[in-house]
Amino acid sequence: MPDYDIITVGGGLGGASFAKAMAERGARVLVVEREAKFKDRVRGEWLAPWGVAEAHELGVYETLISQCGYHPTGWDTRLAGNSIGLRDLAATTPHAKHPMTFYHPRAQEALVEAAERAGVEVKTGVRVVAVQPGATPSVTLQSNGRSASLTTRLVVGVDGRGSMVRKWGGFDSNDDPDQQWLAGILIENTPAPMDYSVAVFNPFASRIALMFPQGDRRARFYFGARSRSRE
């Protein structure tokens, strides 16, 4: 008998949500996360209305909204600094939901905690150094200079765009050439509006600026441009 039904490599939003859902359905699940503590990085912190509907269906919405989530109600689109319309996304999208923003590291922590409450075993600060595919796959873990192999019925790789699980599983990867770049910053005590997000487009320079409020006078700002226009 395998040690686990499922071993999930990666304990971020996707890995923790999947593990929680499967544990609630009776599976024996282990999550292995290499980070001992989640760090702030520039990444998406805005969940579209359809994503909020998915969060409800996955059973993680209440965890997110109670721990770190925030609902800006509107979307302000601006062209070269001039507003061309403030849109109520809940009133104008099929799922009738407001989008959700959140601080990514806290969302990761909240979902890992929810997964543990559902019965998931979580190992943090542990690296996966090998996955052996087969009828009974095995996963080799490494921590504090020691290695151990565990067997499972299914390995789920949720270890990011540089996934080693994908490589160990023999899956092909296709990448587009770099065409855009994106930079972001988290600002506290900002005077930016808290009730709507803002997208400012400059099509002539192929650039975009985004502001996503997270409540409590905190917002994430992004600046994006095509690679050729970033100078």
Task: Describe each model-derived feature in a short phrase.
Residues 1-12:
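Beta1/beta-strand and adjacent pyrophosphate-binding region of the FAD-binding site
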Residues 15:
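N-terminal Rossmann-fold NAD(P) dinucleotide-binding loop
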Residues 23-43:
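Glycine-rich FAD pyrophosphate-binding loop
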Residues 48-110:
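Active-site-adjacent segment of FAD-dependent monooxygenases/related oxidoreductases
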